[in-house]
Amino acid sequence: MEVIVNINNLEYSYNDKNNIFNNLCMYIQKNSITAISGPNNSGKSTLLKLLSTNKYNKKGSIIIDAKDIVDYSKKEYDKLVQAVFPNNSIFKQPKVIDELYINQEEIDEEKTNFLIENLNLTKILNKDINTLSRQDKYRLLISKAILNTNSIVLLDSLDEYFNNNEIKELYTFFRKCIEKYDLTFIITINNLINSIETDYLFIINQGGTILYGEPLKVLDKDNIINKAGLEIPFMIDLSVKLKDYNLLNNIELNKERLINTLWK
């Protein structure tokens, strides 16, 4: 696969104190759903903020689409990358339908209608944004991000706003967008169960990447994950322990299949 984001030796700190990142390296595959997780204060949201604009003062390089982000104009970069930070988002219009159209340089009715249908926005189009649930506000922000980028969508704290089943539905929707609009999704999560149906999982801690790969292969490294202070999903944790006793060959997520395997 093609690498679309390449982060090399990234160093960043707030007010030149307490480095958040120390020589962080990371690469993101194009047309993937990539999850980033880590303990509290590991820099998950900060990393997305650094990717969301090319104006931060930092050391190291961030290459997107084979070009250093500092070499993009603001207009170019805004079209390349769109980010959703739900806690810091400001809506400019009172109604949902008006907010959807406000920043589109050229109105794309097909894309807009696709997003309205697939993000279940039809029932709220004429509602006042202030009356929306947290989930509907986030869905509106996702739709705006997709409308205004041709490449990368960054989504912060996804599982603070949606339950596990809702996130699975969103992943299905993201895959439609990847196929239809050639997009790449980079998300931050707290609960590792929500990484299983992504393509790649990064775990960051103490300024760097400590694990990276396909989610189930990463989650197999239970000792490293536990030392980082993260909780491994129950079925995965159980599978890993059973593998250690040679009772299981692979991680099994389905309880019935696991029982059947053990009773054979």
Label each region the model flagged.
Residues 60-68, 77:
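Conserved ABC transporter NBD signature motif
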Residues 128-132:
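Conserved ABC ATPase signature
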Residues 87, 92-107:
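Q-loop/switch helix immediately C-terminal to the Walker
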Residues 225-264:
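ABC ATPase nucleotide-binding domains
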